[in-house]
């Protein structure tokens, strides 16, 4: 049995390497930007910060990212990194792409592309997830391997971590019994933070009136409707009292903080045929949300009629762990997970006619497959300032900042004969 596993692993590794070579060869035709950076340790989390710095006289703009570390028994850190992204003045030409250097040296389109670590703050154990507070992006909440949720104001910490390894968060949020991943700041109520946990509960804290001395904040409310690990939680983007949660009990639940019943959601739906790992509310359409599952599908929902699943997006070959709507386009969402692929979907193409050849690559709503990762994708983030730019991080320390070629989302014909494109863009 063990021999077969070793053989299967070797075959899989060879397939992954072959696919990666094909992907790399085709990057100039499929992308307007690809930057690949090997982090010292893998990050389980990534989120673009909302600020942009535009240095005068340069052909790039500087964006910043929140990352974490997942080390092997070494000191862990909450990390702020910067990425130089070429602006419209920067000129690229696919023919200048050095295929030998390829993605290892920054890759296609990143003449000036640099990724640098700016701030490292000591953290207790790996950073399961880190998210900034929209009303004050200096404040970042993190999920740890313990039951505590931590909050850091990164302006109050030195950019180089204390060598002692002491972790001194500005606040410690208590209420869970176990670790977890889900974390969501309320975009409409400053300081209101939700967290999902393996202990089957969701905690809500309000840190706006947090103690200045004690540093410990107890949960304001604990929601107990799920009967298994709660994987993710998200506030509605327009209604300050509504949020959604998903769990290993295969359910999607919609909650209203105005309700006195913290054990019964206002809506509960059997969303998938396996664990539900993630959810995302559409930023433009107040009734629409998406969920991603271990059943390999992304489901589309309408809050006005949750009994009926609007659509199921099918193309992933393994568990889905992250789903996020584009901040710039109402019909665009992306999903990623264990199959090492990040899929970008376009709702407006659902039901379009396809040739038999196109159908082999995936359904018409599958706009693009990002094939640059050779390990499970842990998290990704749409850039809020640069349309179509995504940062994705995988378990093998790789972080990629990329933007698909404009002709793909503008429905134009590529400049390249189709015969040269090998099965990545559909």
From Swiss-Prot:
WD repeats lie at residues 47-123, 129-174, 182-218, 229-270, 276-313, 319-370, 377-404. GO terms for molecular function: histone binding. This is Histone-binding protein RBBP7. PROSITE patterns: WD_REPEATS_1, WD_REPEATS_2, WD_REPEATS_REGION. Binds directly to helix 1 of the histone fold of histone H4, a region that is not accessible when H4 is in chromatin. The gene is rbbp7. The keyword Lyase does not apply. It comes from the Eukaryota. One of its GO terms (cellular component) is ESC/E(Z) complex. GO terms for biological process: chromatin remodeling; DNA replication; fin regeneration; hematopoietic progenitor cell differentiation; regulation of DNA-templated transcription. Its main location: nucleus. Core histone-binding subunit that may target chromatin remodeling factors, histone acetyltransferases and histone deacetylases to their histone substrates in a manner that is regulated by nucleosomal DNA. Component of several complexes which regulate chromatin metabolism. SUPFAM superfamilies: WD40 repeat-like (SSF50978). It comes from Danio rerio. It is found in: Nucleus. Keywords: Chaperone, Chromatin regulator, DNA replication, Nucleus, Repeat, Repressor, Transcription, Transcription regulation, WD repeat. Belongs to the WD repeat RBAP46/RBAP48/MSI1 family.
């Amino acid at each position: 049995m063990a021999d077969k596993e070793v053989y299967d692993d070797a075959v899989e590794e060879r397939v992954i390497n072959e696919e990666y070579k094909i992907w790399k060869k085709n990057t100039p035709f499929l992308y307007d930007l690809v930057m690949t950076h090997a982090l010292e340790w893998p990050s389980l989390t990534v989120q673009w910060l909302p600020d942009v710095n535009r240095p005068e006289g340069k052909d790039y703009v500087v964006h910043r990212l929140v990352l974490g570390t997942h080390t092997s028994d070494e000191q862990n850190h909450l990390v702020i990194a910067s990425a130089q992204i070429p602006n419209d003045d920067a000129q690229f030409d696919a023919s200048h792409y050095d295929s030998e250097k390829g993605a290892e040296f920054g890759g296609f389109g990143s003449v000036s592309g640099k990724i640098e670590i700016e701030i490292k703050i000591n953290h207790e154990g790996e950073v399961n997830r880190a998210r900034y507070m929209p009303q004050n992006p200096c404040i970042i909440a993190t999920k740890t391997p313990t039951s505590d949720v931590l909050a850091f104001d990164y302006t109050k910490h030195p950019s180089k971590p204390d060598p002692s390894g002491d972790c001194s968060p500005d606040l410690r949020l208590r209420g869970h019994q176990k670790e977890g991943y889900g974390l969501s700041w309320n975009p409409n109520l400053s300081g209101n933070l939700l967290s999902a946990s393996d202990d089957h509960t969701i905690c809500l804290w309000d840190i706006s009136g947090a103690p200045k001395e004690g540093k410990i904040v107890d949960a304001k409310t604990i929601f107990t409707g799920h009967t298994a690990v709660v994987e993710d939680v998200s506030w509605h983007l327009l209604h300050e009292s509504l949020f959604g949660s998903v769990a290993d009990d295969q359910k999607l639940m919609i909650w209203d903080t105005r309700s006195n019943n913290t054990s019964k959601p206002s809506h509960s739906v059997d969303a998938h045929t396996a664990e539900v790992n993630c959810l995302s509310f559409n930023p433009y359409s107040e009734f629409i949300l998406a969920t991603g599952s271990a059943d390999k599908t992304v489901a589309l929902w309408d809050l006005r009629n949750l009994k009926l699943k609007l659509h199921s997006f099918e193309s992933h070959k393994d568990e889905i762990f992250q789903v996020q709507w584009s901040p710039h386009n109402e019909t665009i969402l992306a999903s990623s997970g264990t199959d090492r692929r990040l899929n970008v979907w376009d709702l407006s193409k659902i039901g379009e006619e396809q040739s038999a050849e196109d159908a082999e690559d995936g359904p018409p709503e599958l706009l693009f497959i990002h094939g640059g990762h050779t390990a499970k994708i842990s998290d990704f983030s749409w850039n809020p300032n640069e349309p179509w730019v995504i940062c994705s991080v995988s378990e093998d320390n790789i972080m990629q900042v990329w933007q698909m070629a404009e002709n793909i989302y503008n429905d134009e014909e590529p400049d390249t004969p189709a015969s040269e494109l090998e099965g990545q863009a559909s």
